[in-house]
């Protein structure tokens, strides 16, 4: 009877096979190298013992890795212990293994590859797939969702294996949803696009910008913008390209205003025609009805006139019924007022184009203008709520006081009263450039209210003081707590400005005479400062206009050259032949625009073009060498001779032809 103990060395050697034979037995689980290198094995049907199915190998490796690294796998329990003195090989071959398994192994889920079912259903025994199908698909991968993001605001992604149904709140940056401002209550909440580059514009959406007519190309204001820093070491006679054109910020501002003026809104529910105006575009940033100022909800639109083709701003009072025709005739007096500090009023009429009775006021349109409430107060809209509102500089407030006093001087001199001096109704059309707006509306709406003009003019002074106090104290509602607002105002500004505001707030008191002329006399020192700033601005604009004068001269030269060169009637003219006296004008065009470098590449140098054209316009004595295209003719001429030939050739074109018809 064999004793149970450690097996002998000979038995261990006899039970262990050779490594070569063991490798041969496991060859069916090893992927053939020909499949890895060439994609197929030519000896697959000729006795190659290796595996030729890459999916089988990957599945087995995944299964083996899961068995090795799974912490929840059942513990190893040998089915039968070898007897004492017997080898494991002999005892395992003679005895029957136990078929019992552990409880953990019984509860383990069976391994099933993801693509096994698809391969078994689609593949055929006689056809072998050369292309390796991936073991995973994009649809099965979990989509990355940032923390704190509401997935209901985004539509499911389509394409790339991500099926989904578009929701009603889907975000599309290239499609503008029509916004029926005729029914403001129908406006829904704005959804946010977390992948937008501009976080503020994406969060606010339509509340930040006016509705666009789909995707638009950006304005091409960068065509002449200088690249890189300016060369401060340039000599006095040296010029840069940007010295000959408008400043970049000024050109950008003008082109943005031009783009805003030409903006349209297709597929809108606004009326196509309102009296003699068409192409209405809403200008309101807040789509909620507000009747606090006029007593009626008001809306502002941009429209084009069919009479002169110009663009105007239409202010509509919703639901207004005209009971007295004399009320609307009061606008005629406002049409005669021409002040640079007031928005000009052109017309007023009633209309039913909006399916109701509306009163329309026609005024000048100032593109990209903002109100003082939007510029300085957080109550101007959600666009300005996130910005820290600092105190308005005192010099800017004095500029506002000067301009409003100028407008009130013109209005009061005409025997009228502004009646509305509110931050939400004063337009900021430029840099610290303001204009009173919506002045004639109250004369029509409250025509039956009998108040003297002197009383209304004194009320203008009170409203004027409340406006400056509101801007200085940075509090929209100073009427509710004027003492606290004045306390903040006193700490931030000089005594002269404080005394001016106090004098305006006491405009209704009868203790002394108060009118706009007395106010202008009191702020005369600040008027001189504002007037001096206006003169400096005039000098700057004149200098910028002088730069554009250079462009006009160069355009005239280019026009003359193109009128003269390459005319078909000059093909057989001796003066334009290769030996003619005007042939050098054709070669000069190649010298300016068609130069090439040593490699034969075109030379695109704006500085060279501007230099040559300026010398041609001046007619200098500098000589240049002009070579024909076939390099057989060469001219050495001066710019003076070129200018003389250009003028004589152009005058010859203007003379009537003497050829018989």
UniProtKB/Swiss-Prot annotation:
Q: Specify where the region named Knob domain lies, as residue ranges.
A: 564-661
Q: Which organism is it from?
A: Emericella nidulans (strain FGSC A4 / ATCC 38163 / CBS 112.46 / NRRL 194 / M139) (Aspergillus nidulans)
Q: Give residue ranges of zinc fingers (C3H1-type).
A: 26-55
Region Pseudokinase domain: what ranges?
263-524
Q: Where is the composition biased (Low complexity)?
A: 77-104
Binding site residues for ATP = 315, 364-371, 424-425
Q: Describe its partners and assembly state.
A: Homodimer. Forms a heterotrimer with a catalytic subunit pan2 to form the poly(a)-nuclease (PAN) deadenylation complex. Interacts (via PAM-2 motif) with poly(A)-binding protein pab1 (via PABC domain), conferring substrate specificity of the enzyme complex.
Pfam families linked to this entry: Pan3_PK
Localisation per UniProt entry: Cytoplasm
Described by its record, this protein's role is as follows: Regulatory subunit of the poly(A)-nuclease (PAN) deadenylation complex, one of two cytoplasmic mRNA deadenylases involved in mRNA turnover. PAN specifically shortens poly(A) tails of RNA and the activity is stimulated by poly(A)-binding protein pab1. PAN deadenylation is followed by rapid degradation of the shortened mRNA tails by the CCR4-NOT complex. Deadenylated mRNAs are then degraded by two alternative mechanisms, namely exosome-mediated 3'-5' exonucleolytic degradation, or deadenylation-dependent mRNA decaping and subsequent 5'-3' exonucleolytic degradation by XRN1.
What are the record keywords, sorted? Answer: ATP-binding, Coiled coil, Cytoplasm, Metal-binding, mRNA processing, Nucleotide-binding, Zinc, Zinc-finger
UniProt free text on domains: The N-terminal zinc finger binds to poly(A) RNA.
Q: Which family does it belong to?
A: Belongs to the protein kinase superfamily. PAN3 family.
Q: Which Gene3D superfamilies match?
A: 1.10.287.3700, 1.20.5.5160, 6.10.250.3160, Transferase(Phosphotransferase) domain 1 (1.10.510.10)
Q: Return the GO cellular component terms, semicolon-separated.
A: P-body; PAN complex
Q: Which InterPro entries match?
A: Kinase-like_dom_sf (IPR011009), PAN3 (IPR030844), Pan3_PK (IPR041332), Prot_kinase_dom (IPR000719), Znf_CCCH (IPR000571)
Q: What is this protein called?
A: PAN2-PAN3 deadenylation complex subunit pan3
User: Where does this chain mainly localize?
Assistant: cytoplasm
Give GO terms for biological process.
Answer: mRNA processing; nuclear-transcribed mRNA poly(A) tail shortening
**Extent of Polar residues compositional bias:** 115-126
Q: Which residue ranges does the record annotate as region Disordered? A: 1-29, 53-131
Q: Name one GO molecular function term.
A: ATP binding
Q: Where is this motif: PABPC-interacting motif-2 (PAM-2)?
A: 63-83
| Segments forming a coiled coil | 525-563
């Amino acid at each position: 009877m064999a004793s149970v103990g450690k097996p002998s060395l000979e038995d261990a050697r006899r039970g262990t096979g050779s490594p070569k034979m063991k490798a041969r037995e496991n060859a069916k689980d090893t992927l053939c190298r020909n499949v890895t290198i060439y994609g197929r094995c030519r000896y697959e049907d000729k006795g190659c013992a290796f595996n030729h199915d890459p999916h089988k190998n990957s599945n087995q490796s995944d299964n083996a890795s899961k068995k090795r690294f799974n912490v929840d796998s059942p513990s190893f329990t040998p089915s039968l212990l070898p007897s004492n003195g017997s080898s494991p090989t002999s005892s395992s071959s003679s005895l029957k293994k136990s078929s019992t398994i552990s409880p953990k192994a019984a509860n383990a889920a069976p391994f099933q590859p993801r693509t096994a079912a698809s391969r078994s259903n689609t593949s055929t025994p006689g056809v072998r797939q050369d292309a390796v199908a991936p073991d995973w698909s994009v649809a099965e991968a979990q989509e990355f969702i940032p923390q704190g993001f509401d997935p209901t605001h985004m539509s499911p992604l389509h394409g790339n294996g991500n099926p989904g149904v578009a929701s009603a709140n889907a975000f599309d940056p290239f499609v503008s949803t029509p916004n029926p401002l005729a029914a403001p209550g129908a406006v829904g909440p704005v959804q946010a696009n977390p992948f937008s580059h501009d976080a503020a514009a994406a969060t606010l959406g339509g509340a930040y910008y006016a509705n666009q007519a789909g995707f638009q190309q950006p304005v091409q204001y960068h065509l002449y913008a200088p690249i890189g820093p300016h060369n401060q070491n340039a000599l006095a006679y040296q010029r840069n390209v940007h010295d000959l054109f408008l400043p970049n910020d000024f050109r950008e501002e003008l082109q943005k205003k031009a783009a805003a003026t030409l903006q349209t809104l297709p597929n809108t529910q606004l009326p196509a025609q309102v009296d003699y105006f068409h192409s209405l575009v809403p200008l309101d940033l807040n789509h909620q009805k507000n009747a606090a100022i006029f007593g009626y909800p008001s809306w502002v639109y941009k429209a084009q006139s069919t009479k002169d083709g110009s663009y105007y701003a239409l202010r509509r009072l919703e639901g207004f019924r005209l009971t007295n025709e004399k009320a609307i005739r009061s606008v005629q007096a406002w049409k005669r007022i021409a002040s640079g500090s007031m928005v000009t009023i052109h017309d007023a009429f009633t209309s039913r184009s909006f399916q109701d009775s509306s009163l329309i006021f026609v005024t000048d349109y100032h593109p990209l203008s903002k109100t003082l409430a939007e510029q300085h107060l957080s109550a101007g809209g959600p666009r300005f709520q996130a910005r820290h509102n600092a105190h308005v500089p005192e010099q800017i407030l004095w500029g506002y006081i000067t301009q409003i006093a100028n407008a009130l001087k013109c209005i009061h001199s005409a025997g009228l009263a502004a009646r509305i001096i509110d931050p939400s109704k004063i337009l900021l059309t430029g840099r610290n450039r303001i204009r009173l707006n919506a002045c004639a509306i109250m004369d029509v709406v409250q025509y039956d209210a009998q108040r003297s003009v002197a009383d209304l003019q004194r009320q203008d002074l009170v409203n004027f003081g409340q406006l400056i106090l509101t801007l200085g104290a940075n509090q929209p509602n100073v009427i509710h707590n004027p003492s606290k607002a004045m306390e903040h105002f006193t700490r931030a500004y000089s005594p002269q400005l404080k005394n001016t505001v106090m004098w305006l707030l006491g405009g209704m008191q009868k203790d002394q005479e108060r009118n706009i002329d007395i106010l202008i006399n009191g702020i005369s020192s600040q008027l001189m400062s504002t007037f001096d700033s206006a003169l400096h601005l005039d000098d700057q604009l004149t200098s910028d206009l002088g730069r554009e004068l250079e462009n006009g001269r160069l355009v005239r030269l280019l026009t003359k050259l193109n009128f003269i060169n390459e005319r078909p009637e000059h093909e057989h003219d001796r003066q334009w032949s290769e030996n003619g006296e005007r042939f050098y004008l054709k070669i000069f065009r190649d010298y300016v625009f068609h130069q090439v470098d040593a490699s034969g590449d075109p030379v695109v140098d704006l500085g060279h073009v501007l230099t040559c054209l300026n010398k041609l316009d001046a007619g200098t004595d500098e000589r240049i060498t002009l070579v024909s295209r076939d390099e057989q003719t060469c001219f050495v001429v001066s710019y003076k001779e070129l200018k003389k030939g250009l003028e004589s050739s152009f005058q010859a074109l203007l003379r009537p032809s003497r050829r018989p018809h």
